[in-house]
Amino acid sequence: MTEPTEPRVGVDDWVAQHEERLEERKGLVGLLGRWLAYAPAPARLAAFALFAGTLPFWMDRGDLFAYGIFTLLYILLGLGLNVVVGYAGLLDLGYVAFFGIGAYSYGLLSSEHYGIHWPALASIPLVMLGTAAVGLILGITSRRLLGDYLAIVTLFFGQAFVVFVNAANPTVHGKGLTGGPNGVVDIDPLRFFGYELTTRTHQYFFLLGTVVVVLTALHFLSESRTGRAWRALREDPLAAEAMSIPVNRLKLMAFAIGAAIAGLAGCIFASVLTAVSPGNFGLPILITIYAIVILGGIGSLTGVVLGAIVINISFQFLAPENPQSNARVLFFAVLALVLVLAVRQRWLGAALVGAVIVFGFVTQAIVEAVAPSWSGGNVTEGGRLADVVQNWVVIPEGHDRFGNFAYVALVVAILVLTRLPGWWRTAALVPTVYLAAIVWENSFVEQPQVARWILFGSLLIGLMTVRPQGLLGTPRVEIV
Amino acid sequence: MELPLAFNDQLFIQLTVNGVTLGSLYALIALGYTMVYGILKLLNFAHGDVYMVGAFIGYGVLSGLGGPLSPDLALAPLVLLMFLAAMLGSGLLGVVIERFAYRPLREAPRLAPLISALGVSFFLQNSVLLLFGAQFRTYNSFVLGSSNPEVFEPGPLIDPVFKIRGVNVQLIQLIVLLVTVGLCVALTLLVARTRVGKAMRATAYDREGAMMMGIDTDRVISFTFFIGSVLAGAAGVMFGLLFSQVFHFMGFLAGLKGFTAAVVGGIGSIPGAMLGGLLVGLTEAYASGYFGGRWAEVVVFGILIFVLLVRPQGLLGTPELKKV
């Protein structure tokens, strides 16, 4: 893509010069950011595909499944949502239902449930058409709705889908259609011309190919007339309509394309897991996909890929099957990073990290001297850093509720922190970060799953208040 | 006098009684949605979870005062205390949510506060999950206040107060209805007759204009969140007393139905929210009575879609005029 020599249509001089007025970031982060911003799209895609292609050669099967396949699935889901929310600006909170419909449809078309075994070349296109049609119908019923109404109707639609597959389970051909809470099991692997994708490596490469194809198609779509019209619609529907852009048709198209991609992801998900159940399509997965799209930056394809990688890696680190040691190392690393990034000067960040460490040892020593029972607890099992943490974080013994109180105190402390002025805030960071460590060791380590949902929820709130455009999104320039 | 009814009228009356009590809860939740929407044009997804937190505050007071089996207080002051604590706690929570999650986004693009609201909802759900665990917590309202709870002798809350054609109306159902009516009357008076009510109406009508007239709109918005959340907190305790069980996920569906009620009645309209709540409650009761409980959500969802298609401004709402 060549640099345009004059401002884009609809952009005046002040807006066009906006980027030049921005301060460029220095250091590694700035370099990476500039590289990502200026590297042409094919180079970015090639770099991603080349790196992702090496994964099966140095990862074992379990890791490939957890990191490789799931990241790619999240990318695919994020790409579909990006079309609806990122390009067209429609807040679709029923997106997961399309994913679910895709997974269930594939499950019914290719499994023992009804004894139908269609090959993937027949079932995947059919399922995609089906989900696109459902998306279209939902879009038609709600096309007159403004943003918020649309959000609630789609949210309700997603919930109605879960209730439908879980509880309603209507009988078709003498068998519950959706299998109720148990879902559909024994789903076939993807089959092309009699060849079945059964190993993780094969599934991974198929998924990678799919993601690359979808990424390419979406790139061209977003640069096309349709893509520009979507963005116009997102920025100002009324002005877009006045410019004779067919608003309704574009909305429906975005809905249908997003739904079709979600349906495709559903097919692959069902075939890889070989079973689907209502629990896979609830609110948590919706939040995860939103976190991916928003973290990366709404409307940015590179952002979706990066967001999916970051979210899935932190997800797997906080998964209960993983040894605690990884989660702990990651958590403290992120805490230190936040501390360094929270202040402008690097030396101050380093000083703060040091201050937190000293603060911890001092607090622990005081507690031990004053009330030994409050520091007698043992650190939760697990590897690296455990010995250090044992002497650094206050872990009471026999005070069951301590973790809960610490958690509430942490939430209050963070809220207060955001209201403090200047230096007070910097100073208050130290005890707050230490409190976060206490909460982690006393409460979060025992329920890592809940902890990660809490962190994701906070991430959404925090990102919206601090940087609503996400990591790679372009900030809106408002002309007043 | 017996009315000639072709169908099982006992079942019908029972469902009506259930529907009215359920509708009271939805009406209270819907009021919070409708007030916030009217004033900020913001869809507060977290409202259902404020209701859930209210139910848990009531539970906390109950178990803090000796638990449902051997409470330290007599029944009346105990229930009153639960209501007051839950209402005050939820109200403060609403103010804090507005202050930290929505106010910084007042000038942001329209998507930002919605996503932030989604985050708040998810955060509250999982915080309660972390603090209280995934198991159901029970108010034990069946034996609450009973002289002999160990043998499950029913308490006074489920005593029949009077009968309608052989169908019992329990004390708790009457309390729910009366408290709801009382709160609605108080709210209507507050909005119609007081200074702060006038400021609320002005802010809802035109925020910038109100600001220029010297109204501290930020405070008015905070106050609106407070009132809405107070009502949700009261509804949370009522849910606990009616159905005995509270859990961390209860706010999600209740929030959706409360919102449906607000939309059906006409969003932004206070009498509309009350009417909508009643309609949704009755529909849900009839749907689960005649088709089975598993279809209740699907039927309510169908009503939402239908109303939005036929009369998008709701039953009592005024159509929005778009100014270019």
Name these PLM-found stretches:
Chain B
Residues 104-105, 113-193, 220, 286, ...:
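Transmembrane helix-bundle core of multi-pass membrane transporters
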Residues 1-29, 57, 68-82, 108-112, ...:
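Membrane-interfacial amphipathic/re-entrant helices at transmembrane-helix boundaries
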Residues 2, 10-11, 131, 205-212, ...:
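Cytosolic-side transmembrane-helix boundaries in multi-pass membrane proteins
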Residues 7-25, 169, 190-195, 221-261, ...:
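Inter-helical junctions in multi-pass inner-membrane proteins, predominant
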Residues 69-120, 127, 275-280, 284, ...:
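Alpha-helical transmembrane segments within multi-pass membrane transporters and channels
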Residues 12-63, 96-112, 264-270:
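Single transmembrane alpha-helix segments in multi-pass membrane proteins
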Residues 22, 165-246, 270-275:
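Helix-loop-helix "hairpin" substructures at the membrane interface of multi-pass membrane proteins
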Residues 38-46, 92-138, 190-197, 202, ...:
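Short loop segments and helix-boundary regions at transmembrane helix junctions
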